[in-house]
Amino acid sequence: MTNYAFKFGYEGSYFTGFQRGNGDHSVEDTIIDTLKASGFDYAIKAAARTDRYVSALSNVFSLETGRSPEAVAGLINSRIDHIYVHSYAEVPDDFNPRHCTFKTYRYYILRQDLDCISLDINLGKFIGTHDFRRFVRADSRNTVRTIINASCKNDNGLLYLEFSARSFLWNQIRTMVAFILDNIGVETDPFSTSERYPRVARAQNLLLWDIYYDGIEFRKVKKIPKKMQGVYENSIMNYILAENLMHRFGIA
């Protein structure tokens, strides 16, 4: 038996969230049930448990198997719609995908009246180590986190906010985004009070972009054409665009 980590993407609207037991069609349930139905009776460990409607380009799960990683990836890619395994790495037996170097999320903003200059006024204040209890749901866990990157980027007219950290709290990114969008052009200290911020930005715009591990090199799955990742990435972006258009015109 060899331990492997797999990078995979999915479109959030087709699932009831990530975590097993979260509704009748979670990402984790779908993967495990598909593997079991094909004789792969393995438990998986996942790096990030994204909320409902949140998509991923590169989440990570690991499992121990006597089969080849290409066989595992091929099974998932051929039998599950809207989930795509695109790379893998052999990892130590004690590997835990949650113990990453850092995760990167992108939150896409479809508003033509905004630019990165106006968004950067408060965005950079989240960088560093802070107590984020104001930006999470009620939780007894330690709410101190270290943000290593919080930046705004413009990709051919499509704005997105990018956040990187070793770990994030539940709804932390979406609540920070709501704060930023509510204070455009107004310099405000996000940590001036501990009172919980009342608004959370829409989940449909959030994308888990990638997860990084020191010393682990992932290989592309060979049996899938290289162009498929680009096609899949485009499908996620089209999904984000469509969801925002429907929301804007009151369809969803």
From Swiss-Prot:
Q: Which Pfam family, an example, fits this chain?
A: PseudoU_synth_1
Ordered alphabetically, the record's keywords are: Isomerase, tRNA processing
Q: What is its EC number?
A: 5.4.99.12
Keyword Isomerase on this protein? Answer: yes
Q: Which residues form the active site?
A: D51
Query: What does the record give as the reaction this protein catalyses?
Result: uridine(38/39/40) in tRNA = pseudouridine(38/39/40) in tRNA
Positions annotated to bind substrate: Y105
* InterPro entries membership: PsdUridine_synth_cat_dom_sf, PsdUridine_synth_TruA, PsdUridine_synth_TruA_a/b_dom, PsdUridine_synth_TruA_C, TruA/RsuA/RluB/E/F_N
Molecular function terms from GO = RNA binding; tRNA pseudouridine(38-40) synthase activity
Q: Name one GO biological process term.
A: tRNA pseudouridine synthesis
Q: Return the CDD domains for the record.
A: PseudoU_synth_TruA_like
This chain's function reads:
Formation of pseudouridine at positions 38, 39 and 40 in the anticodon stem and loop of transfer RNAs.
Q: Which HAMAP family match?
A: TruA (MF_00171)
- Family recorded in the similarity comment: Belongs to the tRNA pseudouridine synthase TruA family.
Q: What name does the UniProt record give this protein?
A: tRNA pseudouridine synthase A
Source organism? Thermoplasma acidophilum (strain ATCC 25905 / DSM 1728 / JCM 9062 / NBRC 15155 / AMRC-C165)
Identify the gene encoding this protein: truA
